[in-house]
């Protein structure tokens, strides 16, 4: 229904569907962290929304003339830390404020591969074209995904007991995958 409030999270598929819904006058919040592909990055983003986290300059890094967040898509990157933080924190505040009123949360997973920043042992939402040596690549198990999602779903239900959650899988292919088998497993 056009009156439903919808938040979409995930891959470029979620982004495209969300933009199509917006163009047709649905009430949507599309990818508050920008495009995210793996289930753990999306869980981390939801935890940050649930906890009303505010980003500081310590959460950013500078590379290639821009400030970036490991958890956000490059649409949030900016030439100054202040501008980057303003974009990130504004979207976080909007998502946190809107969560209790949502009717639908649509989650689209694009891959079961996650990347961990070695230096901080954290899952990242975006590698921002940084050297491979900074990251550990991991194929998530079903058990890991289920465990993380069970916890965040419990918290989401506390904030919004009537929230309907739709999980989808992105129809994308991993063209840059080292092997066709990786695409299949992912």
Residue ranges and their predicted role:
Residues 118-142:
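A solvent-exposed, charged loop/short amphipathic helix patch at secondary-structure junctions
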Residues 112, 154-177:
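Active-site segments of SGNH/GDSL-like serine hydrolases
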Residues 10, 106-110, 168:
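Short beta-strand segments
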Residues 5, 104-106, 164:
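Structural motif
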Residues 109-120:
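Short, solvent-exposed beta-strand-terminating loops
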Residues 175-186:
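Single conserved hydrophobic/aromatic residue that forms the stacking wall/gate
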Residues 4-7, 13-98:
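Basic, amphipathic N-terminal segments that precede the first structured/catalytic domain
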Residues 88-105, 151-159:
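Short amphipathic alpha-helices and their capping/turn segments at secondary-structure boundaries
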């Amino acid at each position: 229904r056009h009156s439903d409030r919808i938040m979409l999270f995930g891959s470029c598929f979620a982004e495209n569907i969300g933009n199509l819904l917006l163009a047709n006058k649905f009430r949507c919040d599309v990818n508050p962290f920008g495009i995210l592909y793996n289930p753990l990055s999306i869980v981390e983003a939801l935890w940050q929304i649930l906890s009303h986290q505010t980003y500081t300059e310590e959460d950013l890094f500078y590379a290639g003339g821009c400030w970036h967040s490991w958890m956000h898509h490059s649409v949030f990157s900016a030439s100054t830390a202040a501008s980057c933080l303003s974009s990130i924190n504004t979207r976080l505040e909007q998502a946190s404020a809107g969560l209790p009123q949502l009717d639908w949360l649509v989650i689209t997973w694009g891959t079961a591969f996650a990347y961990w920043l070695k230096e901080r042992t954290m899952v990242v939402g975006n590698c921002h074209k940084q050297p491979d040596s900074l990251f550990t690549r991991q194929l998530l198990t079903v058990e890991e995904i289920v465990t993380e999602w069970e916890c965040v779903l419990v918290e989401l239900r506390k904030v919004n007991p009537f929230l309907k959650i739709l999980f989808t899988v992105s129809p994308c292919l991993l063209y840059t995958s080292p092997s066709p088998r990786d695409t299949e497993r992912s």
